[in-house]
Amino acid sequence: MSDIEIIEEIQPVSLKRKQPSTSFNGKRKRTSSGLIEKSETMKGTETEFEKFVIDRTITPQRKLNAEDVEKSGEDIGSSEWRKRLECTLLGSVSTPVTVKKENNIRKKISCFNCDGEHNLRDCTQRKDFRRISRKKRESGDGRQRVFYNDVGISKQREKHFKPGVISDRLRAALGLRGNDIPEHIYRMRRLGLIDGYPPGWLRKSIKSTDQLKFFDSTSKEDDEMSVKPPELDTSKIVWYPGFNGEQSSLNDREDFKIPPRDVFCSVYQDELLKIFKKSEKAEKRRAKSTPKHKKFANEDDDDVIVITSDEIKIDKFNTPGEEDSIIILDGSASTEEKHLLTPIRKDVKLGESMFELIGTPVFGSSLLTPVAPLEAFAVGIQPFEAREELTGCKGNFRNLMDKLKEIRENNFVPEPEEEVILVSTNEISSSNNSGTAKNKNNQNRKRNRRHAK
């Protein structure tokens, strides 16, 4: 069968009396556990896992009557959400509620300076900047207050909620009496004293032991700062009645033995130390798995071959220019070092030189390339000469501006310019035509006079 068990209706039977086992077709039916039969609130089965519990409770559905809903709505304040819920559940029995949509009335524009119905830039009165800044601050605070009250939970509301404490209104909604233990406390017990406690509140109850690591000249890479083990702050532990908090008037159906507070704190402190030690061991294993490759001085290598004195041969080479001269290639090492093909490494401390050259330095025998003298860089550069400025040439622009200011203050009126008469091209052409006509008439008169004589 699957993990879902066959659920039967649990009848109110005394705890001492057991129900007879029923059989069907020779097979025994699986009933719910005795723990759930004793429970008055739970009517189902649960599948328990290592870190969590799946609740498979089946709640019977009840038909809602309009009269019962109306009676229950008289005590509790009606809301739009409640009216919509009644319409969907009751259907045609209840009269549909028409929700009036509030018209989004735009806020009137008000001037921060004079409280008029116009923008600040259109205000004609003298601007009072203190009043403007105060009005802007008030309007901004009002907008923020409306926004934060509508969305989320404010800090004032958070103060009303305390972990481990259930309000009377929530108890009434869960069907619990004043001394009943809520169902989540029983599930916390099944997970255990350590795993059942909320891990988020456990992290907050640990004292912070963060430290800064400082490096100086004497510090090394292998130096590790000693990390202190975590400590538990008992003042920040949340006490749940029925789980880790004692209360004599509780109705406990499991008869659970609640440990004292001191024992509870010591158990958690031991658990934190175990976790801390496990993490340290894991870090050490991780460090060992990635070793640093180091070679120390005077360490025997596998590629070193020891040669006896009989096998040593001196290499001789003849130069092409000097046939008689012989050059012997022989190192200046000691007799012990001659037997080794590779030189022996020596211990070198921090700050010491790697090698030494013995001999007197010769002046001018440097291998570095010569650098040009400093005088060569000054070729073509003229020296700077500080000269005094002429005092007579100063303030020309200032004098010009002062004169213009005097002219404006004295209301200087410029002289009227000569009137210029603008004549169009048509008028000029007509005047020219009239002039030519007059000249022709005069010429004709002169001719007539000559003929008359």
Swiss-Prot record:
What are the record's GO terms for cellular component?
catalytic step 2 spliceosome
In its UniProt record, a GO molecular function of this protein is: RNA binding
Q: Where is the composition biased (Polar residues)?
A: 425-437
Report the Pfam families cross-referenced here.
PSP (PF04046)
Q: Where is this region: Disordered?
A: 15-42, 425-453
- Write out the coiled-coil annotation as residue ranges: none
What GO biological process terms does the UniProt entry carry, in alphabetical order?
RNA processing
Designated name of the protein: Uncharacterized protein ZK632.11
Task: Cite the record's Basic residues compositional bias ranges.
Answer: 443-453
Superkingdom: Eukaryota
Q: Which PANTHER family does the protein's record reference?
A: PROTEIN CBG09981, ZINC FINGER, CCHC DOMAIN CONTAINING 8
